[in-house]
């Protein structure tokens, strides 16, 4: 009888141990989303003007969200200033601040400069400049988001601004004391505020009446309006966080 009891106890211990091992979560598969920011289409037929569409306004409440998100509302990021115009880091910080100041509980924390560039899954979040024309012809900027496919949690985000394009801090703002202004440039803060929306997984909007929202999908030279979030941008971030 003693041997039988011992055997039963051992069997129960092994069964319990096996149950713990089997309960370990399976490895998560990682997938990615690529957001490509293109210039405003030019030429005849570039836009469709609906006869009864409402006029574009920053009070438009539209937004697009896929369900992918950060596990916690705290995101650290680095900036590679190589190839960027002077004072770009301050402009980029202001871009993230626009979302941090919106409804919702998202916190962005600047961790300083880095030499890392490009888009690599290294579990670090980086803004850099690089020539992306070959891979993304005509693109102003590209943001790549890696995430766990099963639980839809973000693990890494990188934005690359196209170094082949003209960039300036305060683009289009003419200094009255200077002979020339910054006309004919993409504004760093304007474009990066849009890209920061992708860091939070808000998608691009292309409807006619969304042109004055930050998440409108096209960018333009000397444009500044994306620096300030519209109603739909704020509603989107408030829903996620």
Model-derived regions, located:
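Positively charged n-region of N-terminal signal peptides that target proteins for export
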Residues: 1-6
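Disordered inhibitory propeptide/activation segment of secreted metzincin zinc metalloprotease zymogens
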Residues: 18-87, 143-151
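Metalloprotease/metallohydrolase-associated module, dominated by Zn2+-dependent proteases
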Residues: 24, 147-151, 155-172, 183-186, ...
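Bacterial N-terminal signal peptides
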Residues: 9-17
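Short, conserved helix/loop micro-motifs enriched in His/Cys and acidic residues
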Residues: 71-81, 170-178, 213-217
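Metzincin-family zinc-dependent endopeptidase catalytic domain
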Residues: 88-193, 199
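Generic detection of long, well-ordered alpha-helical segments
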Residues: 85-90, 227, 231
């Amino acid at each position: 009888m003693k041997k039988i009891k011992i055997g039963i106890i051992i069997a129960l211990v092994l069964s319990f141990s096996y149950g713990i091992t089997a309960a370990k979560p399976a490895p998560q598969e990682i997938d990615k989303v690529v957001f490509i920011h293109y210039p405003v289409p030019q030429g005849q037929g570039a836009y469709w003007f609906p006869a009864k569409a409402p006029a574009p306004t920053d009070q438009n409440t539209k937004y697009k969200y896929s369900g992918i998100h950060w596990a916690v509302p705290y995101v650290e990021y680095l900036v590679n200033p190589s190839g960027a115009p002077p004072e770009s880091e301050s402009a980029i910080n202001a871009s993230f601040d626009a979302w941090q100041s919106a409804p919702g509980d998202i916190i962005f924390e600047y961790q300083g400069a880095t030499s890392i560039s490009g888009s690599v899954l290294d579990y670090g979040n980086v803004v850099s400049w690089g020539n992306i024309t070959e891979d993304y012809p005509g693109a102003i900027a590209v943001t790549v988001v890696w995430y766990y496919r099963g639980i839809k949690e973000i693990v890494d985000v990188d934005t690359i601004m196209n170094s082949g394009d003209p960039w300036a801090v305060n683009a289009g703002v003419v200094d009255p004391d200077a002979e020339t202004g910054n006309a004919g440039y993409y504004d760093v803060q304007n474009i990066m505020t849009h890209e920061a929306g992708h860091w939070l997984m808000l998608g691009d909007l292309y409807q006619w009446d969304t042109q004055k929202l930050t998440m409108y999908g096209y960018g333009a030279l000397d444009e500044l309006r994306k620096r300030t979030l519209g109603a739909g941008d704020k509603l989107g971030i408030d829903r996620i966080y």
